[in-house]
Amino acid sequence: MHHVLYGLAANVALPPELVDRLIAVADAATAGVLAGRDDLTHEQAVALVARDPDTAQQLAHAGLLTAADIDPATHPDAALTLLDRRAGDPEWARLLVRDPLVRNRQSLAACAGLPPDVMETLAADPDVRVVAELAFWTTPDRAAALARHPHAEVRRSVAANEAAPPAVLAALLTGEGLPPARWCLVCDREDTPFVHPRECPRPDCDLLPGESCDGSHDSTVHGTRQQALRNPATPTHAVVGFAGHPSTPLRWDLAARPDLPREVSARLAADPSPRVRADLAENPAIGATLIRAMADDPDHDVRRRLARNPHVPLDVLARLAGTTRIGSALLPRVAAATPHEVGEWARSADPEVRTLLAQRRDLPAEIRDALAADPDAKVVKSVAPHPGLSDGRLRAMVGRHGVRVLAAVAANPDATPALLADLTRHRPPVQKALRAVARHPRATAPALLACLADRDAGPLAAGHPALPPPVIAELLTDTDPRRAEAAAANPSLPPAVMSELLAVL
């Protein structure tokens, strides 16, 4: 019965009076589902919190609770959510900054618009995790001050703060101009030198695998450099020297930056690490000359990532299509192709090129229809979900290529109800096609009834509003709890049946 209640709680057609009745009897799981409804009134939200206090934070985040509804002493999570939305009472911050739970003070440190005195208190918190959280979110001036904090973990958080001044980020990256850190999370609790094992036997240990300290807080310093390299506010002149750094992860992060000078990009293109070259290959900052050179990279992932670069020349992309498993997603450069380029690719002799083009969903009708009649099944599968294809063309695609294109045809938004029903009658059944039919907004009862027996398509069909109401009601007692829950969530479930379900509770 519980799964039926979960479905009912999510049903968008549940009348307001039945929402009230369900709130009154909801267990914790059902209350959580109810809290996610888009149609809750303020009064219902207050009643739901009274029924299950754990929903307060979710409801506050949804804007359904006000400061008048919340006591920060009993609902600190909800109070913190309202503070972060700048909808809470500022005095709450002065109360919560003294909260004995570290996680609550950490959450407070992440809130926007805190009073200055609260930020001062957080910056001096006895638990470094609170100070580090503040450092990640705080203002430029306070970030500059916290960059000199004696604990390396705080400095690492400053390095990730995009509001930190560029000069401060440069200093954190290079270490120049800052006093040495005195502590890190490793030497806080372990005698040094220490390297945390990959498989730690202590259940209460929260150090990450491989974290280490030899007295120089080496793993935290390395992490600080990683954060600074990832931070777009770190100035270019500070990062370029890391192109030859012995740490491969640092070169990974450098290779993804959008501000790389040409000579640094060229050096990274010859990096011994394929991961570095792959991150560089997808970087929109590299020019056409380097892209052409990298197209011959021996590593498959480098070439695959290069194909996703939005500035890859189409002739290079065509070459990559024949040598690299690129995948089925629409590539940025293909999406940006001009009408002239689209026409050239449609006439390409290479089916891989035509397949990439067929992923677009805005093709001219004559090109779309030509691709739908392509002799290569991969091209047809790629274009099959394109809007505007006629029923006759979709049926012809199935007739020529069968199971290879069935699911793609079923996903076409213009597929007719009759075609969808015919697709479900294919033998042997194509499960992916059944799932596509069960999701399709144009599916009607004959198609949906055929989908119900399938393990994965069945729950989708049970929740489809075109399913006949008597069938939906019957599914409420189905042995598969997923189908029963989906049926309870079906907006076509008659209100009288909804009321009967609640009457037996």
Language model: regions and residue ranges:
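Alpha-helical scaffold segments
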Residues: 1-505
